[in-house]
Amino acid sequence: MRKRNILGLFVGLIIGLYTVLGMSLFTFFNLKYHSVYYAQHIPHKEGTDPDLVMLVENMGWIYTPEIDGIRYDNDGTNAIINTKSKSFLTKSSGSFLYDKDNMTIGFDSTFRFEDVSYFSEEAKRTKVNESKIKREIRKDFSPIMKVQPKPLINLQWLFNIIYQSRFN
């Protein structure tokens, strides 16, 4: 009788442990795979772009369909290349970089404008308009964001708890 109780307790603990582990893994994968969807719906401060941040940060986790003119480079740092507009978006040392027309625009970890680097005299004469640049980025990479699937089990509330302080 005593062996039965110990065995039952042991089996119950193992089942409970596997259940908690399974739920934790499901939650982790759900938040990563649907991060762009959740980021599109998170309340955030003006000037921050959580969806663009999640697009690059979680490129290895999100749905990355084959789209004509879009290439994904994840052999070290994540980069998304638009071959039609000859631009790319990447993350480097905690910042985000957008490269187009012989200039690289730097953004901080919340996608707020930081700096510009020019690689030609012609590019130096170009005035940088932050809102115009962000519209170009959205135009170049919106085909990826538009096809992100809606989660079956919506964990928006948990995503908001985790990332709210970063984007406000």
Question: What residue spans do the PLM features occupy?
Answer:
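N-terminal export/targeting and maturation segments
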Residues: 17-99
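Non-cytosolic head/periplasmic domains of membrane-anchored proteins
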Residues: 87-168
